[in-house]
Swiss-Prot record:
Regulation: induction: Induced by abscisic acid (ABA).
Biological source species: Picea glauca (White spruce)
Lineage: Eukaryota, Viridiplantae, Streptophyta, Embryophyta, Tracheophyta
Keywords annotated in UniProt: Antibiotic, Antimicrobial, Disulfide bond, Fungicide, Lectin, Mannose-binding, Plant defense, Signal
Protein name as annotated: Antifungal protein ginkbilobin-like protein 2
Positions annotated to bind alpha-D-mannopyranose: N36, R118, E129
Superkingdom of the source species: Eukaryota
Signal peptide residues on this chain, from the entry's feature table: 1-24
GO-annotated cellular components: plasmodesma
Disulfide bond as UniProt keyword: yes
Length: 133
């Protein structure tokens, strides 16, 4: 292989690695959060409604124009959970879903079980409340 061919092949490989890394996982760095000061009492059935809502946001936001609102009716006397999932338009559907799934798994710790929260990662956002949003 000549030096010119080797240089070209090396350049193509470097470019391929850069493109692959740029198209990789979403940016899930925490940007901001704001949480209601009231907490969900331990064992409250609202946890179940909210958990189902978060899964709904994770699964459907990417396929609803990257901006999706939903609610989960209260059960066991618990209030209805309302929420919104949003992703940057510049990321792929799979990255949107991955970002929201990442956030859904972290939101309990970030919000410290608040009855309402807004949490922004670099590539996605979730808001949930006990009232319509």
């Amino acid at each position: 292989m000549s030096m010119g061919s080797f240089g070209f092949a090396l350049a193509v490989m470097v470019l391929a690695v850069l493109v692959a890394s740029a198209a990789g996982a979403p940016n899930t760095n925490l940007v901001s959060s704001a949480c209601n000061g009231n907490k969900i009492p331990s064992g409250n059935p609202f946890f179940n409604n909210l958990g189902a809502l978060l899964v709904d946001l994770e699964k459907n936001t990417a396929f609803s124009g990257f901006d999706y609102k939903a609610s989960r009716a209260g059960s066991g006397g618990a209030p209805t959970a309302y929420g919104r999932g949003v992703c940057k338009q510049s990321i792929s559907q799979s990255d949107c879903t991955a970002c929201l799934t990442n956030l859904g798994g972290r939101i309990w710790g970030i919000s410290k079980n608040a009855i309402g929260a807004r949490v922004q990662l670099t590539d996605c956002f979730i808001r949930y409340e006990q009232y319509s949003i």
